[in-house]
Structures are given as C-alpha cells and as structure tokens.
C-alpha cells in the first residue's frame, strides 16, 4: 500500500522533512485542519491522529555532536576518548531522536557523560527496520540490516556497548534481527551488546557505580 510504504520510509521522510523550507511548510501543514482532512481522504491518515513535528536541525548534523563515520578515518580520533575508557558506549540515534526529538538523545548523552561514560554516535546509521518488518517487507529489513550491523559490529569489536533511546529499536536489534537472521554472527554479537539506556545505567547502579548526584 502506497501510504504504508511512505510512512515506514523513515530515513527518507526525515531527510526531506528536516530541510529548512520544507520543514516549516510540513509542520504547518500537519497542524492545518484543511491539510489533515486532505490526508485523511487521500492517504487514510486520520485527521485527529497526532503527528510528530520534524526538526530542521537533526541531531547528527548538530555542531559538537561526536559521531563515528567509517568512511572518515579521522572520526575515530575525534571521538570522546571512548577507546581509552572502561565504559565505552555507542548511541544508536534512531530516526525519531534524530529527526523529531533530538532532545531525547541529548538527554541520554548528558546522563551518560555525567557518569563519566564516553559516548559517541554512529554517523551513517539507517532506520533499524522495525517499521518495514511490521509491513512484512523483509527485503527492506535485510537491506537496512546490512547497512547498520557492520557499523555497530565494528564498535562492539572495539569494546563498546550499544544503547538506543527508542524501545522498539532496542527490541529490533536485541530480539527481532537475531530471530530473522539466526546464522548471522555479527547480528548475534550486536544483539548481545545492545542495551536499553536505563538497563545499562541500572547495571552500574547494582555495582554502586552510578552517579545519582545532579
């Protein structure tokens, strides 16, 4: 279905919707009763459904954000020093945190840094694939898996744990991908290293290593 293919193409929508002029027009249209009525009649997106706003400053494009880009050799040297720290964490930003609510990911980063945990982002990540999987579009899921897993596996090999602030993304990497690709050793390694942020922080708390002084 055309509508389903569009709304599950989160990378594409995010990239387009975050463009300065398009961003303002789209956010205004999503609040317009007339435009919402048009969407309801043409794409069957209910006129009263709450649609997220899009930022014109995606997290991965913000100055000062530390991200790992395998195509840029200098990106490792520009990291927060995670390679020299006992707690090494990579944040999978997710489409939602990158294009809709960067403040969520920024809060995770601040919380981890408050606990002296060096954290970096994956600069060339793609959607986790959960929206496409819910459509049964396994071809797209495989394509997204092949784009994400090698990047994350490289971080796991260097001793990083991985976290994501969106639960469905955590579920995708920890449970769904291993079920879909049971013979993929890289998928297994990434799944074993993937944590919900609070799960990771609670593991520190149990070891009495969590800084709760704010």
Residue positions per predicted region:
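Iron-sulfur cluster-binding electron-transfer modules in prokaryotic oxidoreductases
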Residues: 1-214
């Amino acid at each position: 279905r055309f509508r389903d293919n569009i709304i599950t193409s989160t990378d594409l929508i995010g990239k387009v919707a975050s463009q300065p002029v398009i961003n303002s027009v789209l956010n205004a249209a999503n609040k317009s009763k007339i435009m919402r009525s048009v969407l309801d009649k043409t794409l069957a997106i209910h006129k009263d459904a709450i649609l997220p706003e899009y930022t014109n400053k995606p997290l991965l494009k913000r100055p000062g954000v530390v991200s790992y880009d395998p195509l840029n050799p200098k990106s490792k040297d520009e990291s927060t020093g995670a390679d020299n720290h006992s707690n090494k964490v990579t944040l999978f930003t997710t489409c939602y945190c990158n294009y809709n609510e960067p403040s969520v990911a920024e809060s995770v980063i601040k919380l981890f840094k408050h606990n002296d945990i060096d954290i970096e982002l994956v600069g060339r990540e793609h959607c986790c694939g959960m929206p496409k999987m819910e459509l049964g579009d396994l071809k797209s899921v495989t394509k997204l898996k092949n784009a994400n897993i090698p990047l994350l596996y490289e971080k796991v090999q260097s001793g990083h744990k991985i976290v994501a602030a969106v639960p469905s993304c955590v579920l995708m990497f920890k449970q769904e991908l291993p079920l879909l690709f049971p013979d993929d050793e890289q998928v297994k390694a990434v799944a074993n290293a993937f944590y919900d942020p609070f799960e990771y922080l609670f593991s520190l708390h149990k070891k009495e290593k969590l800084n709760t002084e704010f």
